[in-house]
């Protein structure tokens, strides 16, 4: 029995069911109209486990990256080593590097240094050779520093000077022997230096300045070539020799008269010779003008003048 008063109807349930279905259709249509094309779907359910795991991994990676950036290189290295031992096993001694084959810049320069570089040496340049060549370019190659400790065996060692030695005057104003600081009585020597370098025999002509004692050591077996200063000699006009006095003396009156006559005659002769010389010079200059262009005189450049000046100053 449905309804009130004991009356029931077969159409009452159908009307109620039809109204609810219409409402549902309207809500679905309204939602479709109100949704935007780029709007994401609503998750009414719990997220999938894989989605949650990806979010957690991303957050953990962000935190780990932040901590690694805050560390320095050594701290990062120790952390990675500890993590490797923790997760994969092993001993800490396995991660210690051997320093037997380590080389410093000084070791590389000693292995690849050359006393003189030529074009063949610069053909195949590795980073070791470039480092040695860069050091070679900083050396001053005017005078050498010598090692005369084995002079009795006729064995000598030579090297170029560094900037500190050039500033202090070692090898130029002081003795060029590395164990001597004498600055008096220095002499310049030119030595043909024969040496073996990288299995190849070479020769080089070097200059050095030594004191008297060190010069004796250098020339202990045979004498080397000494460089002497070549100063320009000043041109001096030869003076006329005085004529010897005559033994026979004339009286003073005759000598006075003769002196006057000789003075007048010599003055006239000198004037005539001057006039003739002036005329000859004028005629020669006029004739030379028509022969051709004037010969070019070789003038010394400023660098050559400085070289001559310093050569006279230092030697």
Swiss-Prot record:
It is found in: Nucleus. The modification N6-acetyllysine is found at residue 36. The modification N-acetylmethionine is found at residue 1. Transmembrane segments: none annotated. Residues 225-235 have a biased composition (Basic residues). One of its GO terms (biological process) is mRNA splicing, via spliceosome. Residues 1-28, 225-308 are annotated as: Disordered. It holds the Pfam family Fra10Ac1. GO terms for cellular component: nucleus. The modification Phosphoserine is found at residues 9, 12, 283, 285. Coiled coil: none annotated. Keywords: Acetylation, Nucleus, Phosphoprotein. InterPro entries: Folate-sensitive_fs_Fra10Ac1 (IPR019129), Histidine_acid_phosphatase (IPR050645). Residues 236-245, 255-278 have a biased composition (Basic and acidic residues). Interacts with ESS2. May be involved in pre-mRNA splicing. This is Protein FRA10AC1 homolog. It comes from Mus musculus. The gene is Fra10ac1.
């Amino acid at each position: 029995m449905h309804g009130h008063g004991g009356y029931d109807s077969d159409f009452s349930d159908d009307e109620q069911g039809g109204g609810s279905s219409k409402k549902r259709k309207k809500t679905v249509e309204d939602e479709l109209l109100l949704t935007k094309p780029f709007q994401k779907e609503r998750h009414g359910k719990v997220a999938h486990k894989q989605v949650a795991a990806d979010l957690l991994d991303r957050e953990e990676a962000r935190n780990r990256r932040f901590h690694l950036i805050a560390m320095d290189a050594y701290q990062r290295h120790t952390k990675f080593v500890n993590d490797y031992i923790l997760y994969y096993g092993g001993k800490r001694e396995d991660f210690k590097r051997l320093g037997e084959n380590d080389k410093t810049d000084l070791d590389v320069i000693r292995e690849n240094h050359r006393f003189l570089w030529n074009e063949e040496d610069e053909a195949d340049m590795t980073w070791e050779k470039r480092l040695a060549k860069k050091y070679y370019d900083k050396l001053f190659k005017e005078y050498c520093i010598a090692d005369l400790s084995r002079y009795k065996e006729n064995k000598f060692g030579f090297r170029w000077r560094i900037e500190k030695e050039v500033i202090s005057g070692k090898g130029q104003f002081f003795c060029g022997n590395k164990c001597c600081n004498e600055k008096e009585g220095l002499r310049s020597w030119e030595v043909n230096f024969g040496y073996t370098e990288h299995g190849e025999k070479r020769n080089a002509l070097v200059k050095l300045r030594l004191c008297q004692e060190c010069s004796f050591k250098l020339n202990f077996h045979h004498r080397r070539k000494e460089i002497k200063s070549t100063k320009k000699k000043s041109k001096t006009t030869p003076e006329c020799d005085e004529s010897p006095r005559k033994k026979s003396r004339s009286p003073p009156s005759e000598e006075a008269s003769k002196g006057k006559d000789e003075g007048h005659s010599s003055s006239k002769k000198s004037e005539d010779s001057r006039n003739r010389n002036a005329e000859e010079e004028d005629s020669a200059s006029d004739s030379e003008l028509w022969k051709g262009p004037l010969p070019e005189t070789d003038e010394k450049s400023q660098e050559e003048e400085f070289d001559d000046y310093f050569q006279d100053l230092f030697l």
